[in-house]
């Protein structure tokens, strides 16, 4: 099974808190048990290996355990946020969804089957090699969103390496690879994920104080709002050790203000693409936007001012566009 390594970690840490959701502490034992229950439910619902499943929700107990169970079943997963339905019809049509699973804000689960039978060549390839798939969508800011198809087993490889983990606020959405990357990194290292009812500065400040959160992954837009709202004077944020930022451009002025407001907190820029995953990064200084990307499993080069990336976890391709690859196998 492609996630045996995860469940080995879960079993070793079964009594530890894996998730804090709506103030409730969920242990690793819950995810062991619940994933097994979903596997039985899949039999009833006709969800077999290779089935294309849209999973809509947030980082709730049922949604996370369903996500893990779908990987274990070698399904092709389209993660969808239950707070962002922009362009949903286009995405559903592109991805040839065969089954919808919905997790509402109270973590109730509903199922809906379609009459579609997926037949895209990339899906057929995943079925042939008996691997789970993951479909991620671009933002669509310059046109229709692109649907990137991954062999999920290759993306999971990096989570097999032991790394330091934190009590982490899973700020980014469920349909964002940054959010899924944070979740998988935390769970694979027996850390604790804390989820938010909403992503307002006050809610985040309250959660940091109550749960002694150490790592806050966020967007520059939110971090600017956090500074403007003055939550550092309303809540005790002393537990924070690291703030990571990405998903959109950071202004130098905002970064300087962050460093001044939180001089003891490490500020780290992240870099990722739906086509290759999240790369390891290194900055000159916390208040510098200069960034070196790469790390284990990634090769980089610059050709005529354009970044090229090579990694085993590069997408199989897009469902609805040509994949920009060089003749010698680099993603452009």
Residue ranges of model-derived segments:
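Conserved AMP-binding/adenylate-forming core of the ANL superfamily
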Residues: 7, 15-46, 150
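Conserved AMP-binding A3 loop
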Residues: 27-28, 125, 130-160
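Conserved ATP-binding/catalytic segment of the ANL
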Residues: 306-332
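Flexible, low-complexity linker/hinge segments
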Residues: 106-132, 149
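Gly/Ser/Thr-rich phosphate-binding loop
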Residues: 215, 229-287
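Conserved AMP-binding/adenylate-forming
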Residues: 24, 40-83, 171-173
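Conserved AMP-binding/adenylation subdomain of ANL enzymes
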Residues: 156-167, 175-215
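ATP-dependent adenylate-forming carboxylate-activation enzymes
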Residues: 57-58, 77-94, 191-210
């Amino acid at each position: 099974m492609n996630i045996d390594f995860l469940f080995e970690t879960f079993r070793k840490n079964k009594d530890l808190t894996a998730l804090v959701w709506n103030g409730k502490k969920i242990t690793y034992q819950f995810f062991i048990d619940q994933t097994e229950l979903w596997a039985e439910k899949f039999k009833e619902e006709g969800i077999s290996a290779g089935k294309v499943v849209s999973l809509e929700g947030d980082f709730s107990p049922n949604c996370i355990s369903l996500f893990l169970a779908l990987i274990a079943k070698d399904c092709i997963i389209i993660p969808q946020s239950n707070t962002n339905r922009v362009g949903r019809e286009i995405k559903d049509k592109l991805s040839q969804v065969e089954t919808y699973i919905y997790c509402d804000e109270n973590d109730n689960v509903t199922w809906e089957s379609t009459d579609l039978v997926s037949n895209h060549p990339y899906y057929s390839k995943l079925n042939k090699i008996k691997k789970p798939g993951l479909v991620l969508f671009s933002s669509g800011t310059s046109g229709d969103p692109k649907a990137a198809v991954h062999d999920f087993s290759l993306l999971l490889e990096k989570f097999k390496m032991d790394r330091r983990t934190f009590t982490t606020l899973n700020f980014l959405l469920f349909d964002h690879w940054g959010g899924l990357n944070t979740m998988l990194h935390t769970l694979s290292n027996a850390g604790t994920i804390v989820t938010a009812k909403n992503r307002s500065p006050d809610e985040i400040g309250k959660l940091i104080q109550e749960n002694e959160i150490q790592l806050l992954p966020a967007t520059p837009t939110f971090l600017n709002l956090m500074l403007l709202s003055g939550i550092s004077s309303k809540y005790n944020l002393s537990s924070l050790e690291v703030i990571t930022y990405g998903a959109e451009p950071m202004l130098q002025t905002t970064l300087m203000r962050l460093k001044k407001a939180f001089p003891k907190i490490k500020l780290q820029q992240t870099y990722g693409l739906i086509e290759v995953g999240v790369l390891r990064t290194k900055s000159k200084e916390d208040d510098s936007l200069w960034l070196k990307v790469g790390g284990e499993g990634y090769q980089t080069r610059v050709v005529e001012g354009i970044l090229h990336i090579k990694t085993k976890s590069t997408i199989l391709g897009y469902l609805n566009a040509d994949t920009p690859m060089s003749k010698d196998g680099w993603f452009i």
